[in-house]
């Protein structure tokens, strides 16, 4: 049984837990994390949702999922990335782009810079069926043509400007480190 911590509309902890199988009461929210892995070529890692998934089966997405009861957002992001791809990162490597409140959840959008070979990715059974690196242009085209899960694309577009500022600024810092 998967349990979530519950929050109010201002993200104040309600000191209650919720069983994922039950509908959320109005005014109650849980936390969902999205992790966008970006390599040194500025490509974005996407994974294919398993064909047996109830929603958005066979659609591409960024890694993500619900934060479990007792976890912080960063701990949930580290866990989800490891479970769905086998990629290990530390909480300190995660860069929070922002958070947005949805209908029943707060979505925390993280970026992590990591060079990973596709052959090293370990897909989670019944969750992910494939993985690939795509350029930003390909990612946006996937969103436009519906092969990228719609909520993933919508949330990415909300944070797109911050995403590119972060990537470009980090790249500039790395150039100066090499001088």
Question: In which residue ranges do the predicted regions lie?
Answer:
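A glycine-rich, hydrophobic loop/mini-helix early in the fold
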Residues: 32-64
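The catalytic Nudix box helix
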Residues: 45-46, 62-95
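Acidic, metal-coordinating catalytic segment for phosphate/diphosphate chemistry
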Residues: 1-34, 38-40
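Short loop segments at secondary-structure junctions
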Residues: 10, 39-42, 50, 113-118, ...
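Nudix hydrolase/Nudix homology domain
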Residues: 57, 96, 101-107, 111-179
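A short, polar/proline- and glycine-enriched secondary-structure boundary/capping micro-motif
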Residues: 25-27, 55-61, 132
